[in-house]
Amino acid sequence: VPVPTRLVNVVAIQRGTERPNEVVIIQAHIDSRASDVMNATIDAPGANDDASGTALVLEAARVLSQRTFPTTVVYAALSGEEQGLLGGRLLADYAKEQGWTVKAVLNNDIVGGSTGSDGYRDDAHVRVLSEGPRADATDALRAQMRRFGGENDSPSRNISRWVAKLAEADTEKGLAVRQIWRADRMGRGGDQLPFSDKGYPAVRFTVAVEDYEHQHQDLRTEGGVKFGDTVDEMDFPYLAKVVRLNVAALMAIANAPPPLP
């Protein structure tokens, strides 16, 4: 961000009735970008990246705000993701400052399309990305993980496994989880990462196949190929399935009892 800019996240907090300091966060980002991330004047629609995730968060809030939960649910639409995960860092810092016990962060980023750049369509899967041990861990930390666990059982990985089982058990949704054991896609990032950096369990939901012509692109047509992240490229029935999986996961985690002392 080249000039001082006020960063605004849109956050709704549904307080828990029994353990309000235990928190589940569902989030997406409301900003978008064109081909040049520094171009702040050109039209830059972001239907899939990430209006799809924002719509998911709003629908989750509409449905779940009619219920009560023992733990707190936070619905967050974050700013500045494309400029360096700024809104995610702001909310993660706030969670730390407030002393929240964050049970899970469900980050939804690019969840509304089912067709890839090569025309292959997959509306039966959603990827869930989760970070394990850091590659730059110290020798002391590696030794500790070997002794006490952690090589492949990080809290984020366990959330991924659990969400996959949740989807598997509900065959009516028509959606299976493809677990990706990486922090994010190759060379990419998302607002789950600032939470992972602070030790909070966090995963990212994203589409099964990448459509590079319709993300981070100026609106144009080249060689008969249309570029740009526009609403006509969305698959709303697919998005609805991802919404339902998120809502089911959120309800279960928000209702779960605390760990035994």
Set out the residue ranges of the language-model regions.
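Second-shell loop/turn segments in exported
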Residues: 1, 38-50, 63, 77-78, ...
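Short helix-loop-beta-strand segments that form the rim/entrance of peptidase-like active sites
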Residues: 62-86
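Short, solvent-exposed loop/turn and secondary-structure capping segments
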Residues: 22-24, 35-40, 85-89, 116-120, ...
